[in-house]
């Protein structure tokens, strides 16, 4: 079985969870990883095959989402290009940890995610 594990890199929570999940998946299946979001120095034991820029959320000083900045400062043409280039069709299973590029690619390609 071939599995794609897609991880959001905002913060360290998703990546910390991945550190525990990756070895378990590798015991039972062939695993490839993609990431999206801001560059992060958190080291995964398994290197991602691809990193996408994805979508960035911008926040106000009090921690809520700044919707104006989020809407206007993301490059949606690049995002669409990333979605269309994400190879979701070559996997038997996609595990998605809040990673938007593979999720949208799976939706557009009628692949369960």
Predicted regions and their residues:
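Nucleotide donor/acceptor-binding cores
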Residues: 1-2
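Conserved nucleotide-sugar phosphate-binding/catalytic loop shared by glycosyltransferases and other
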Residues: 5-9, 31-79
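A short, glycine/small-residue-rich beta-strand->loop->alpha-helix junction that serves as a flexible
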Residues: 6-19
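A short, Lys/Arg-enriched amphipathic alpha-helix followed by its capping loop at the start of a domain
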Residues: 21-29, 42
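A generic structural motif
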Residues: 26-33, 89
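An aromatic- and histidine-rich active-site surface loop
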Residues: 41, 94-109
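Conserved nucleotide-sugar donor-binding subdomain of glycosyltransferases
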Residues: 64-101
